[in-house]
Amino acid sequence: DANKEKKNKKFDFSVIGGPHYSSDTKFGLGLVAAGLYRTDRNDSLLPPSNVSLYGDVSTVGFYLLGVRGNHLFPQDKYRLNYNLYFYSFPSLYWGRGYDNGANSDNESDYKRFQAQVKVDFMFRLAKNFYIGPMAIFDYIDGRDFDKPELWEGMAARTTNTSLGLSLLYDSRDFLTNASHGYYLRIDQRFSPAFLGNKYAFSSTELTTSYYQPVWKGGVLAGQFHTLLTYGDTPWGLMATLGSSYSMRGYYEGRYRDKGAMDAQIELRQHVWKRNGVAVWAGAGTIFPRLSEFTPKHILPNYGFGYRWEFKKRVRS
């Protein structure tokens, strides 16, 4: 049974795949292969490390392949976090800024290919507190623009190499599907011209989450996220709203600018065996700079969904 943790196995591995439908990618077939392992099997307090291979194809020509994971060294003294992926997607673009995103007449087609490699290595300074360097490589290629004027003269293809520093406080009980604890991470990223970047910019990203059991099978989860970029930020690396984790239902990238901010509160309820449900409410906005944040541009978000736990403490 993939939903039972196999502590006697050095590497607990499971695979799940199936059809899906969304308004963006239409009908598709997704696959996730997830593994859990412990670097010190005698340490019951050390959370398991994890690795996932994920892929997707759909009827509109979308394809995705990637691998991500968190490797926790013995005694949790160090952490290696990584995410590598590439995808191709017939996408939509509205331009930069709130007004462009809110204007439905700006909707334009283009083809997008993107690849990213992101790695960080964290050193533990104190209980639950880590610091370490990170490196990011991005390649973004846009083609066949329906309305090229919306790109405002920016290059369709960009290659970007970044170095940075991460600060982390993490008291979650489980990295992939927490039921209690705090998570706070600050990433400071630098993309200078001397690394070969055509667009020199920097960014500051803050992600914080809180998890609290409320009753049997129920977990209250709160999240706040902001991404601020400075300098000559390329279109493909601007802050955006919309993902499978926050501001769900908004087309990812419709609202994009040099800064974005969103918050969400979610109630998760285990129902039966692997099945669960969730309801959430949140809000988000974008802005060219933090000083130009305006409440009238805040977008609401709310809904409910189904949660499937195909592996113990790993949701699909």
Protein language model features and the residues they cover:
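Short loop/turn motifs that connect adjacent beta-strands in outer-membrane beta-barrel proteins
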Residues: A2-F11, T39-P48, P74-R79, K127-N128, ...
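Gram-negative/organellar outer-membrane beta-barrel architecture
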Residues: E5-S14, H20-A155, T159, R254-D257, ...
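Residues on the lipid-exposed face of transmembrane beta-strands in outer-membrane beta-barrel proteins
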Residues: G17-P19, L31-G35, V67-H71, V117-F123, ...
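Transmembrane beta-strands of outer-membrane beta-barrel pores
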Residues: Y21-S23, G35-Y37, G55-G61, H71-F73, ...
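Outer-membrane beta-barrel proteins
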Residues: G28, N42, Y78, F89-G95, ...
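Flexible, surface-exposed loop regions and adjacent strand-edge segments
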Residues: Y87, G97-N103, P148-M154, S203-E205, ...
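C-terminal outer-membrane beta-barrel translocator/porin domains of Gram-negative envelope proteins
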Residues: L163-L168, R172-W272, V277-W280, F287-P288
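C-terminal beta-signal and terminal closure region of outer-membrane beta-barrel proteins
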Residues: T294-S316
